[in-house]
UniProtKB/Swiss-Prot annotation:
The lineage of its organism: Eukaryota, Fungi, Dikarya, Ascomycota, Pezizomycotina. Pfam families: Suf. This is mRNA 3'-end-processing protein rna14. Keywords: Cytoplasm, mRNA processing, Nucleus, Repeat. The gene is rna14. Residues 20-185, 215-237, 621-653, 840-941 are annotated as: Disordered. Component of the cleavage factor IA (CFIA) complex, which is involved in the endonucleolytic cleavage during polyadenylation-dependent pre-mRNA 3'-end formation. GO terms for biological process: mRNA 3'-end processing; RNA 3'-end processing. It comes from Emericella nidulans (strain FGSC A4 / ATCC 38163 / CBS 112.46 / NRRL 194 / M139).
Length: 1075
């Protein structure tokens, strides 16, 4: 039947990944024939609705060479146990569509020519990008006259050079020394004689087309791994360009140094067109790399290629908010519009509009201070005089004031300098109006200054690079530094969201613009981190910025096509915004587009992983072949030689197996991801199109059929499809899907568990027990799979303990004890009666109040132990009572009120101290055997150390202190009787100290200028003075050490106390050296 073909393809795909998937397909193929008449919902749709894929169209546009290319095939008697080589190619044509087309692919085969016995491709001299040139809006119109109407030839500025080429090993000995230039559009490895070139649309698993018939026949039956840079042969040591091209082809997103070295290599050889080509290829992979755009623009500017330079500006300025890029643009505009010859004012107008455009896009950056300063200086250089009365003067004044007021509100490095310039500008025009403007702008300036300080503190270690790197795997090199950069960027984003500039209420648009700007800056460095793209899009959607949010998602998917997070978010947005679409087929096609792109990227990763596995295995085998074999001695036996050979072979096999196991883990994770992508698509199509109708609407069943055709899926897809059929439609097809999945995944414990749950949900207990016995028996037969049976046993044990027979429960527990002897029996028994949130077998009721008696609090955190401990060096003082009045002990009677411990009186005589020492020794001897179990009453105070007790016994009593004592009552009364003046003018001063403050005052031999007010000189030494200022502030002048001492005396005197109470004291210390 039709379903057999699909299942057969699935079996063959699963057999190639048996190591990572963990199932056996031997008896599944036989079961397929016996159950061919069973119903499967996907079998009714697979013929009418083939799996959609963009790459399927490539087979229609292949050249005759690729069409006639022999395809590798599998024999029908493949290993049924799943022991096939992990790197075998898929045997179905559907899997070929999963490989994405390289970015440099073209639809027309290039023309070839033969040079020196080598087949090479002609270079493409066309430059299609120049024809669509549009000048920037702010550039002068007069510049259009010098732009050529025809595209500039690709090699116009390229000097003749002799680049290196790539050769095979056979060609290294026989080929001529003549080199041929590489293509300027794509790096093509030259093939020698019987080596065919791989078609750009060809699947990665297809073998290369050969020119010799016998080699073509061999490639039809063998499964060679495709050539790769790591294993490609024939690169000459001095072929620097070819080696770098190989590195880029192998890892275009991860090997950034190879890109940079290749650009430098071309530029050092004066191959400008080749350098341009590498720049273009690099910027397709990293389109937000402002550093490389700046380098590209700088190269064109140095070559005086102004037309190409303007093209770069048109492509980047409005999409890449980078201060460096806008600086290059402003330099170009000022270069093209000289002010020295500007008689009409048109050049100044163009430059001014360019500055306005730049500040509109990057003026909020904390590194934009130089552009603000240049803009202000540009305005100052304009016609008119600041402070003049003409219309040009007034216009210039208004422009400067507006520019300053905009600049001082931005938290940037130059904000302090610009504020000082603005202060001088306003005060130089009119002090009265200047104070008014400064007072109005001061809050904004203070907020910007404090915000910049705070921002600079936590971004000090931030690396604002625009050359993104792939996230290192945890535990790999650079993972800590990468996580640190992510944390700093997130702190900056959250800081902007917190609205430190208080813009949300006054200017909501500016607040949103600042947050989006920081997101764009972060994404330049964290381009390959999907979480940041998701957060940026989500912020835009929550703030009514639908266009910006969709743009973030689109660019994020371009950067991370294998990200499930971004693809799912994009699909959700399309599903929500397309609710008005009445045609479910059109709506489903629109929603399915992100899923298809994600699946293509994931299948491509699986293909690359398998290719990498084959390369690693081939490299290991080549390494063992190149090892020199030790020559056995003449008296060695053949048995020793054979044992040594076997040992080497076992070592090689062990290393190869380790490599394959490592790759199988990665492929298994990728297969899991592919499966959940199919599940998400299946659920989305169910919401939009339902389960589908044959010949009308595909629905979720068609997605299930597509997933089975493309392969590389786990049991999760079968589980999800079956549960959708059951929960949404109550369709009997759910049981059929579970039955088919049980044959495909006989050792998958998760699938068996879900199958059991489904059978119990439909009340098919007999089949549930049968499935349980079959699964457990099969898993327990292999000791390595015994642990997989534990969740299955636990589930059925829980069901039987609630709804089954006690004999069944006991039998299950007996089998569980045999399989898991380390598990405690108590837990198995308690599992019968417990729930996830309560276990009655562990409940201990409170029977007596003594069970709830509070714990005894011991001083110092010491808790008495059950076993005796060595006695401390000093006995506890709580049992050391004064011989004068013994301390009463009511510990035995808990009902009587507790008394506070009375402080011990000092022991005056020597006899009393002797009695105390004898009492301590007696108590110490009695406490030794029972010191650990001694009971102390609750809440007793901590004992005093022996040294403190001794000190209290030797100090004199309080009656012997005859000196003067401080009286707090008299001090408070003195403060109450103070006559505080209402103002400064009411302070009585000596007539001799009054003056007009017009001269100088000598204090301690030093001269102080009189700036208004009165002086009061204190002390005979004349070393300090209290200056009463006209503005109501006390200023205390001091001179030298004596002046400082006298200032403190005066400060706490009557006048100083008055100044302290008024809180208006200023201490003025001119730091005059002491005389």
């Amino acid at each position: 039947m039709a379903e057999d073909d699909a299942e057969k393809a699935f079996f063959e795909a699963q057999a190639m990944n048996a190591g990572s998937m963990g199932y056996n397909g031997a008896e599944d193929q036989n079961a397929n024939a016996s159950d061919s008449d069973e119903y499967d919902p996907s079998s009714t749709l697979q013929d009418q609705y083939p799996a959609p894929s963009e790459n399927l169209q490539l087979q229609e546009t292949d050249t005759p060479t690729s069409v006639s290319q022999p395809q590798p095939s599998f024999r029908e008697d493949a290993d049924p146990a799943g022991n096939a080589h992990p790197s075998q190619p898929p045997s179905r044509p559907e899997s070929q569509a999963s490989t994405s087309v390289p970015a440099t692919g073209v639809s027309v085969q290039p023309k070839t020519r033969t040079i020196g016995g080598f087949v090479v491709e002609d270079e493409d001299e066309d430059d299609a990008g120049d024809a669509d040139y549009e000048p920037p809006a702010v550039l002068g119109v007069e510049d259009m006259n010098i732009i050529p109407s025809q595209p500039i030839p690709g090699n116009a500025n390229e000097a003749t050079s002799t680049p290196d080429v790539s050769l095979d090993e056979a060609a290294q000995e026989s080929a001529s020394a003549k080199n041929v230039p590489n293509s300027s559009l794509s790096s093509v490895s030259l093939a020698f004689k019987n080596d065919g070139s791989m078609d750009l649309g060809q699947n990665l698993y297809n073998s290369r087309t050969s020119l010799q018939p016998e080699i073509a026949r061999e490639s039809a039956t063998a499964t060679p791994a495709p050539d790769s840079p790591s294993t490609a042969k024939g690169r000459l040591p001095h072929d620097r360009v070819g080696i770098l091209e190989d590195r880029i082809r192998e890892d275009p997103r991860g090997d950034i140094p190879a890109w940079l070295e290749l650009i430098n290599e071309h530029r050092s050889r004066n191959r400008i067109d080749s350098a341009r080509d590498v720049y273009e290829r690099f910027l397709k992979v990293f389109p937000l790399s402002a550093e490389m755009w700046v380098a590209y623009a700088t190269m064109e500017s140095e070559l005086n290629e102004l037309f190409r330079l303007e093209q770069i500006f048109n492509r980047t300025l409005l999409t890449i908010p980078a201060v460096q890029l806008w600086t290059v643009y402003l330099d170009y505009v000022r270069r093209r519009n000289p002010l020295s010859t500007d008689t009409t004012g048109q050049a100044r107008k163009v430059i001014s509009s360019a500055y306005e455009l730049a500040l509109q896009h990057i003026g909020m950056d904390k590194e934009s201070g130089s552009i603000w300063a240049d803009y202000i200086q540009f305005i100052r250089s304009g016609p008119g005089n600041v402070g003049g009365s003409g219309w040009q003067d007034q216009q210039k004044m208004d422009l400067l004031r507006k520019a300053y007021q905009r600049a001082i509100c931005v938290p940037m490095q130059a904000v302090n300098t610009l504020w000082k310039e603005y202060d001088q500008f306003e005060m130089g025009l009119n002090k009265l109006t200047g104070r008014k403007f400064l007072q109005e702008q001061s809050p904004s300036y203070m907020t910007a200054r404090s915000s910049y300080t705070e921002l600079q503190n936590f971004t000090r270690d931030l690396n604002r690079t625009t050359l993104p790197r792939l996230p290192p795997v945890p535990g790999s090199e650079g993972d800590f530094e990468y996580l640190q950069q992510i944390e700093i960027w997130k702190r900056w984003i959250n800081w902007e969201k917190g609205d430190p500039l208080v813009l949300k209420e006054d200017d909501l648009t500016a607040y949103k613009g600042r947050v989006v700007y920081v997101y764009k800056q972060a994404l330049m460095a964290l381009r390959f981190l999907p979480e940041i793209w998701f957060e940026a899009a989500d912020f835009c959607f929550l703030n009514d910025m639908e266009t910006e949010g969709n743009e973030f998602l689109k660019n994020g998917i371009d950067a991370n096509p294998e990200s499930c997070l971004l693809a799912f978010k994009r699909a959700d947005r399309l599903e929500i915004t397309s609710e008005s679409e009445q045609d479910p087929i059109k709506r489903g096609a629109k929603v399915r587009e992100p899923y298809d792109r994600l699946l293509d990227a994931l299948y491509d990763l699986i293909a690359k992983a398998r290719t990498r596995e084959a390369q690693d295995v081939a490299r290991l085998e080549e390494t063992f072949k190149l090892r020199p074999d030790t020559q056995p001695a003449a008296n060695d036996d053949d048995d020793d030689d054979q044992s040594e050979t076997k040992a080497k072979e076992s070592v090689k096999n062990a290393q190869i197996e380790a490599v394959r196991h490592a790759h199988s883990i990665q492929i298994g994770i990728l297969s899991k991801t592919v499966s959940f992508a199919w599940i998400a698509l299946m659920r989305a199509m169910r919401r939009i199109q339902g389960k589908g109708k044959p010949g009308e609407v595909p629905g979720s069943r068609q997605v299930f059929a597509d997933a089975r055709k493309r392969g590389r899926i786990t049991s999760d897809v079968y589980i999800a499809s079956a549960l959708i059929e059951y929960h949404c439609y109550k369709d009997p097809a759910a049981t059929k899907i579970f039955e088919r999945g049980a044959k495909l995944f006989p050792e998958d414990e998760n699938f068996a568990l879900e199958y059991l749950k489904h059978l119990i949900d439909i009340n098919d207990i007999i089949n549930a027990r049968a499935v349980f016995e079959m699964t457990v028996r099969k898993l327990a037969a292999n000791p390595e799979n015994v642990h997989k049976t534990k969740p299955i046993f636990a589930f059925l044990h829980e069901y039987e303990s609630r709804y089954g027979d006690l004999v069944q429960v006991i039998n299950l527990e007996t089998r569980m004890r045999e399989l898991f002897p380390d598990d405690p029996t108590l837990e198995q028994f308690a599992h019968r009666f417990s729930a996830p949130n309560f276990d009655p077998t562990t409940f201990r009721p409170i029977i007596s109040p003594s069970q709830t008696r509070p714990k005894t609090v011991y001083p110092g955190g010491q808790v008495p132990s059950r076993h005796g401990t060595p006695s401390s060096r000093f006995p506890e003082a709580s049992v050391t009572n004064s011989p004068k009045r013994p301390l009463e002990d009511f510990d035995d009677d808990m009902s009587r009120p507790r008394k506070f411990v009375r402080g011990e009186s000092p022991l005056r005589t020597t006899t009393q101290r002797r009695q105390l020492d004898q009492q301590k020794r007696t108590q110490t001897a009695l406490q030794v055997p029972s010191s650990g179990s001694q009971y102390r009453s609750q809440g007793s105070p901590a004992p005093l150390p022996r040294d403190i007790v001794y000190l209290l016994s030797v100090i004199p009593p309080a009656s012997t202190y005859t000196a003067g004592r401080f009286s707090a009552e008299k001090m408070i009364d003195l403060v109450r009787r103070l006559d505080l003046p209402a103002s400064i003018s009411q302070i009585p001063l000596p007539q001799s100290a009054r003056g007009l403050g017009t001269g100088q005052t000598t204090i301690g031999g030093q001269q102080f200028s009189d700036d208004g007010g009165y002086y009061y000189k204190g002390g005979v030494v004349d070393m300090c003075a209290l200056h009463f200022m006209d503005d109501g502030v006390f200023r205390l002048y001091v001179a030298g050490l004596a002046g400082n001492i006298l200032a403190r005396i005066l400060f706490f005197g009557s006048g100083g106390l008055l100044a302290y109470l008024l809180r208006t004291v200023q201490i003025w210390d001119p730091e005059i050296p002491r005389r």
